[in-house]
């Protein structure tokens, strides 16, 4: 069986709506739906790669019942490199686009994109290509030169700020003290020529 994909999204209506559209208008077969990453990983670990229902593509929401969809994509990329991941989200700011790329996703598409765009995205990814919507490409190009001059932790903090995360959330996620985050943030501001968080978001979020 070809054209097999799974959908991982914690909203039942989204999963069912995507499945209905894709199976009615394309040759894709949505064999499995999951509302969390644990069940998806557990299922894949028990499924032989040669099985006819082994997926070519996963459509993954960024946020899954409090979980991080990016972490799922990282684990898929590491443990199942033959599976291609498409991030599907309401968020289309620079921080999310950067993190999707870093996690190993082949595409990032907004949930408000037209159905035809999603189909086009899947076609490209199936052919080993990548996909971003036009306005996302502009965003990525805008920040690509910035990212290259940042350290790993500065980049992590840059992405987190663009996602609207507080300093405490950044501390918790990166396992850093508040003072350490403040130091990295200060160096980040200096490198990208902004004076504070508000200016960074205004300058680089779109």
Residue ranges and their predicted role:
Residues 48-59, 64:
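Active-site beta3 strand of CheY-like receiver
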Residues 186-206:
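Basic, Lys/Arg-enriched C-terminal extension of HTH/homeodomain DNA-binding domains
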Residues 61-62, 89, 111:
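Active-site residues of response regulator receiver
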Residues 97-101, 107-152:
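Short, flexible helix-to-coil linker/hinge segments that flank and couple to helix-turn-helix
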Residues 14, 65:
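The feature encodes the CheY-like receiver
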Residues 36, 68-71:
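Acidic catalytic/metal-coordinating carboxylates
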Residues 141-180:
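Helix-turn-helix DNA-binding segment
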Residues 70-82:
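Short amphipathic alpha-helix used as the core "switch/output" element in two-component signaling
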């Amino acid at each position: 069986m070809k054209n097999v994909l799974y959908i991982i999204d914690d909203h039942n209506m989204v999963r069912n709506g995507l499945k209905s559209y894709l199976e009615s208008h394309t040759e894709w077969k949505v064999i499995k739906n999951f509302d969390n990453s644990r069940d998806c990983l557990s299922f894949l670990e028990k499924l032989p790669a040669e099985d006819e229902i082994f997926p070519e593509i996963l459509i993954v929401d960024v946020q899954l019942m409090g979980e991080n969809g990016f972490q799922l994509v990282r684990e898929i990329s590491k443990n199942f490199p033959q599976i291609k991941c498409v991030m599907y989200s309401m968020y289309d700011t620079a921080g999310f686009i950067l993190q999707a790329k870093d996690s190993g996703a082949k595409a990032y598409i907004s949930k408000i994109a037209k159905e035809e765009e999603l189909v086009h995205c899947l076609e490209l990814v199936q052919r080993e290509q990548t996909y971003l919507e036009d306005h996302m490409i502009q965003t990525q190009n805008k920040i690509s030169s910035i990212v290259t001059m940042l350290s790993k932790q500065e980049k992590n903090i840059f992405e987190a700020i663009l996602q609207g995360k507080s300093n405490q959330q950044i501390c918790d996620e990166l396992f850093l003290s508040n003072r350490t985050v403040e130091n990295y943030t200060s160096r980040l501001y200096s490198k990208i020529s902004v004076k504070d968080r508000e200016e960074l978001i205004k300058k680089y979020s779109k």
